[in-house]
Amino acid sequence: MNKLIRKGCVAVIYSPEFGAGWSTWNRKYPEILFDPAIVEFVEKDQSEELQVYVTLKYPGIYDGGIVGLKIEWIPEGSFFRVNEYDGAENIELRDRIRWIQA
């Protein structure tokens, strides 16, 4: 799976807005979480080009979460998960979870 890495961090794409998730609503395409081309389109605010790219590269994808995509840079090798509630996604790093022991 291709990933964009800068200064030891990996670009992770997520949709923080309520309504529709991005990777959480498209489990068939796990690579959309890291796709370097999508990262570039988001960073350059090229929404029309992004829409065309996603439609051609990922046929049948649900793209409701494409508006408002964000990039979070996570240290390479870190474990994380993408949580989703009502379409709004957030990224949770394993090292930042405070576990409670019974």
Give, region by region, the residue ranges found by the protein language model.
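Catalytic phosphate/metal-binding cores of nucleic-acid and nucleotide-processing enzymes, i.e., regions
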Residues: N2-A102
